[in-house]
Amino acid sequence: MSKAVLRFIRLSPTKARLIAREVQGMNAEEALAALEFMPNKAAKVISKVITSAVANGGYEPEEVVITSCRVDRGPYLKRFRPRARGRASRIMKPTSHVYVEVAQKKDS
C-alpha cells in the first residue's frame, strides 16, 4: 500500500469530493482515463495525486486499486472586496487537502 497527499490546494472541497467519490474503489488506470475527460479542476488535481501515489509505491497503474480517496477542508484564504460607501465584503477562498491510498490488486 502506498499513499500520496496534496495539501493547501486552492480548490473547493465540496466540488472535489464529487470527483473523489467517483474514483474510489476503481483500478488506477481506469480512474486516470476517466479523470482525463472530466472538465473540472478537481479532476486534474486528483489525477496528479493518484499518479503520485502509484509512483510512491513503485507500481504500474494497471496493477493497483484506489482503496481510499479523501478530500478534507483546509483553511480559508480571506480576501476583501471594496463595496459602496467605504465598506468591504469578505471573500472566502476555500482550500483542500487531498489524500489518496492505493494497494495492489488481489488476484483471485
Swiss-Prot record:
GO terms for molecular function: rRNA binding; structural constituent of ribosome. GO terms for cellular component: cytosolic large ribosomal subunit. InterPro entries: Ribosomal_uL22 (IPR001063), Ribosomal_uL22_bac/chlpt-type (IPR005727), Ribosomal_uL22_bac/org-type (IPR047867), Ribosomal_uL22_CS (IPR018260), Ribosomal_uL22_sf (IPR036394). Keywords: Ribonucleoprotein, Ribosomal protein, RNA-binding, rRNA-binding. GO terms for biological process: translation. Part of the 50S ribosomal subunit. PANTHER family: CHLOROPLAST 50S RIBOSOMAL PROTEIN L22-RELATED, LARGE RIBOSOMAL SUBUNIT PROTEIN UL22M. This protein binds specifically to 23S rRNA; its binding is stimulated by other ribosomal proteins, e.g. L4, L17, and L20. It is important during the early stages of 50S assembly. It makes multiple contacts with different domains of the 23S rRNA in the assembled 50S subunit and ribosome. This is Large ribosomal subunit protein uL22. The gene is rplV.
